[in-house]
Amino acid sequence: MSDVEQEQIVEEVVVEEQSGAITIEDALKVVLRTSLVHDGLARGLREASKALSKREAQLCVLCDSVTEESIIKLVEALCNEPEEKIPLIKVSDAKLLGEWAGLCQLDRDGNARKVVGASCVVVKNWGADSDERNILLEHFSQQ
């Protein structure tokens, strides 16, 4: 009986360590994957700008390494409209954002192959409520 009690204590400690170690990028990755499953992602500049102008967006993720400066200005302007400001996160790598948004092929081991870069991704539907979503919302409320 004492073995079972010790195992439960160890599991509780592990859960506490994992919840405290989640970074914004890890939370963003999980939120994008959940939103993709629930058909709530707008991937690419055309779909993202439509969702932003219709005010359907909950969150916008923009790539910093875009070569065209007008793309960055357009997305930032659509996110910062005075009626309703949409949270904006900037990511450094387009290929990484494309992989998170599902713009890739997966091999048998689950590794991403043939990743296509994404300049902008918009979350229109969060999907399921999760701890990662709450972490992102707390991050935006602090800013």
Curated annotation (Swiss-Prot):
Its main location: cytoplasm. GO terms for cellular component: cytosolic small ribosomal subunit. The keyword Cytoplasm applies. GO terms for molecular function: structural constituent of ribosome. It is found in: Cytoplasm. Keywords: Cytoplasm, Ribonucleoprotein, Ribosomal protein. InterPro entries: Ribosomal_eL30-like_sf (IPR029064), Ribosomal_eL8/eL30/eS12/Gad45 (IPR004038), Ribosomal_eS12 (IPR000530), Ribosomal_eS12_CS (IPR047860). GO terms for biological process: maintenance of translational fidelity; maturation of SSU-rRNA; ribosomal small subunit assembly; ribosomal small subunit biogenesis. Component of the small ribosomal subunit. Mature ribosomes consist of a small (40S) and a large (60S) subunit. The 40S subunit contains about 32 different proteins and 1 molecule of RNA (18S). The 60S subunit contains 45 different proteins and 3 molecules of RNA (25S, 5.8S and 5S). Belongs to the eukaryotic ribosomal protein eS12 family. This is Small ribosomal subunit protein eS12. It comes from Candida albicans (strain SC5314 / ATCC MYA-2876) (Yeast). The gene is RPS12.
